[in-house]
């Protein structure tokens, strides 16, 4: 079944392990918390200390609830960044809003919805592919891909249009470019521009679909499994950093 993830920026980095007991009491159930320190290199030739993140995964114990009810929260933080943390969550449990309000009250944080720009959506597509590295690009799983655009005109004379790239073409374009950890950004999107004159990052991109795997939209991501890759999480955190004008 598909899982829809929503994303919220957080004004400071949280230490969730200190508050789980209170959350258990509030929800009257056990909250399963997993804490990891992960490294997601931004440079294909290696990583730095700036590429180290703390990842919290918080799952509500739903053993006594309906099978169709579930809830998961993932937090990613890096204390060296100006915006040090964000969270994403999926699930049908009505306790999700309770958890969000508790986080604001318990830690005194400000949260805001994250909206992805076109360039970020392409980066997320790259990050969604299974373990892309310079060494294994020939072994990764490729997906038929579709980019949807929805122009906004005063009289609504233009409607949604899309570009579809078959799985074999995605693979061929990426391999033809050479070893790259960013096949969509480095090979597929430039090919679209060269062949059509359409600059994807300047068009009203509304979604990127990797068939049967991931759908990336402006305000959410839909996955086929109840998880998000570390590289996807890192791209999201990097995308919400403030930039000086």
Curated annotation (Swiss-Prot):
Keyword Cell division carried by entry: yes
Cysteines paired by S-S bonds: none
Similarity comment: family membership: Belongs to the CENP-L/IML3 family.
Compartment(s) where it occurs, according to its Swiss-Prot or TrEMBL record: Nucleus; Chromosome, Centromere, Kinetochore
GO biological process per UniProt: ascospore formation; attachment of spindle microtubules to kinetochore; cell division; establishment of meiotic sister chromatid cohesion; establishment of mitotic sister chromatid cohesion; maintenance of meiotic sister chromatid cohesion; meiotic sister chromatid segregation; protein localization to chromosome, centromeric region
Provenance organism: Saccharomyces cerevisiae (strain ATCC 204508 / S288c)
CDD domains per UniProt: IML3 (cd22875)
The keyword Chloroplast belongs to this UniProt entry's keyword annotation: no
GO CC terms of this entry: kinetochore; nucleus; outer kinetochore
Biological function: Component of the kinetochore, a multiprotein complex that assembles on centromeric DNA and attaches chromosomes to spindle microtubules, mediating chromosome segregation and sister chromatid segregation during meiosis and mitosis. Component of the inner kinetochore constitutive centromere-associated network (CCAN), which serves as a structural platform for outer kinetochore assembly.
Extra remark beyond the main annotation: Present with 125 molecules/cell in log phase SD medium.
Subunit structure as annotated in this protein's UniProt entry: Forms a heterodimer with IML3. CHL4-IML3 is part of a larger constitutive centromere-associated network (CCAN) (also known as central kinetochore CTF19 complex in yeast), which is composed of at least AME1, CHL4, CNN1, CTF3, CTF19, IML3, MCM16, MCM21, MCM22, MHF1, MHF2, MIF2, NKP1, NKP2, OKP1 and WIP1. Interacts with CHL4 and CTF19.
Name the UniProt record assigns to this protein: Inner kinetochore subunit IML3
Keywords on record: Cell cycle, Cell division, Centromere, Chromosome, Kinetochore, Meiosis, Mitosis, Nucleus
């Amino acid at each position: 079944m598909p899982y829809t993830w929503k994303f919220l920026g957080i004004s400071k980095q949280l230490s969730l392990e200190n508050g789980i007991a209170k959350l258990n009491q509030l929800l009257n159930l056990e909250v399963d918390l997993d804490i990891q320190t992960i490294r997601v290199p931004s440079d294909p030739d290696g990583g730095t200390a700036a590429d180290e993140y703390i990842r919290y995964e918080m799952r509500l114990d739903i053993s006594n609830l309906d099978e169709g009810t579930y809830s998961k929260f993932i937090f990613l933080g890096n204390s060296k960044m100006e915006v040090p943390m964000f969270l994403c969550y999926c699930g049908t449990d009505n306790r999700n809003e309770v958890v969000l309000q508790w986080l604001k009250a318990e830690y005194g944080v400000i949260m805001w919805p994250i909206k992805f720009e076109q360039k970020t959506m392409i980066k997320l597509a790259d990050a969604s592919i299974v373990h892309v590295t310079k060494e294994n690009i020939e072994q990764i799983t490729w997906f038929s891909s579709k980019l949807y655009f929805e122009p906004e005109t005063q009289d609504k004379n233009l409607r949604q249009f899309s570009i579809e790239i078959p799985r074999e073409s995605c693979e061929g374009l990426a391999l033809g470019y050479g070893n790259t950890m960013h096949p969509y950004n480095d090979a597929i999107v430039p090919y679209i521009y060269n062949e059509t004159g359409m600059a994807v990052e300047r068009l009203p991109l509304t979604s990127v679909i990797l068939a049967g795997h991931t759908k990336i939209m402006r305000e959410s991501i839909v996955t086929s499994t109840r998880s998000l890759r570390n590289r996807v999480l890192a791209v999201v955190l990097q995308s919400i950093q403030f930039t000086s004008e």
